[in-house]
Amino acid sequence: MAVGKNKRLSKGKKGIKKKVVDPFTRKEWYDIKAPSFFENRNAGKTLVNRTQGLKNANDSLKGRVLELSLADLNNDQEQSFRKIKLRVEDVAGKSCLTSFYGMDFTTDKLRSIVRKWQSLVEAHVDVKTTDGYVLRLFAIGFTKRQSNQVKKTTYAQSSQLKEIRAKMVEIMRREAEGSDLKELVQKFVPESIGREIEKAAKGIYPLHNVYVRKAKIVKTPKIDMSKLLESHGEAMDANTGSKVVKSGEFVEPEILESV
């Protein structure tokens, strides 16, 4: 008789399946709070794994970038072509406090404004706001057909396009560097920067469909909790804490009058 293990007997029973655990039982929902310069503060909810061992749920949420439609944030369907990025900066209870992290156009909007027989003008520039944010702004515009024009095309000369780009850069830099981040974001929605570019370029070549199509955060200053809470419409107590004595620093105790 052969000595050894019987391979058939050592195998487990067939048909026994491993117990499947629903991954959503280990997760919990957190509310997304948009900054106060948006009308709808409750932007939505996000999922994260519960705090377990050394893994903290708050650490997993901080730095998370969320993309939302401006139509949902401002309750205005006409702004549905703008996508807003928000980044989670801090977690308070079950609420994620976010800050503005970027803006972009939807693909269908960009494709809808491109037309034949006209010149496309694009420019980008890095700007710094008064509160220390560095953004890269991208502008787009198109040459406009005149009312008394006979020619079919509205192509601008390369020298004219160069002048228009210089005007775009100048206006974007001027509008951004004189504003903080909140004021700059509020200029994107009514397209006040685009109208300024149209006025400035009128003497070079008339434009239409001029937009700041994209805004990208390049550099952010160190997060100040008081400013973050202020942007969310929450006030901090002035007496947030008391001075802590450094280790190794001796402080003589006060003399008591009576014991």
Curated annotation (Swiss-Prot):
<dbReference type="GO" id="GO:0022627">
    <property type="term" value="C:cytosolic small ribosomal subunit"/>
</dbReference>
<dbReference type="GO" id="GO:0003735">
    <property type="term" value="F:structural constituent of ribosome"/>
</dbReference>
<comment type="subunit">
    <text>Component of the small ribosomal subunit. Mature ribosomes consist of a small (40S) and a large (60S) subunit. The 40S subunit contains about 33 different proteins and 1 molecule of RNA (18S). The 60S subunit contains about 49 different proteins and 3 molecules of RNA (25S, 5.8S and 5S).</text>
</comment>
<dbReference type="GO" id="GO:0006412">
    <property type="term" value="P:translation"/>
</dbReference>
<dbReference type="Pfam" id="PF01015">
    <property type="entry name" value="Ribosomal_S3Ae"/>
</dbReference>
<dbReference type="InterPro" id="IPR027500">
    <property type="entry name" value="Ribosomal_eS1_euk"/>
</dbReference>
<feature type="modified residue" description="N-acetylalanine; partial">
    <location>
        <position position="2"/>
    </location>
</feature>
<dbReference type="InterPro" id="IPR018281">
    <property type="entry name" value="Ribosomal_eS1_CS"/>
</dbReference>
<keyword id="KW-0687">Ribonucleoprotein</keyword>
<dbReference type="InterPro" id="IPR001593">
    <property type="entry name" value="Ribosomal_eS1"/>
</dbReference>
<keyword id="KW-0007">Acetylation</keyword>
<dbReference type="GO" id="GO:0005829">
    <property type="term" value="C:cytosol"/>
</dbReference>
<protein>
    <recommendedName>
        <fullName>Small ribosomal subunit protein eS1</fullName>
    </recommendedName>
</protein>
<comment type="similarity">
    <text>Belongs to the eukaryotic ribosomal protein eS1 family.</text>
</comment>
<keyword id="KW-0689">Ribosomal protein</keyword>
<keyword id="KW-0963">Cytoplasm</keyword>
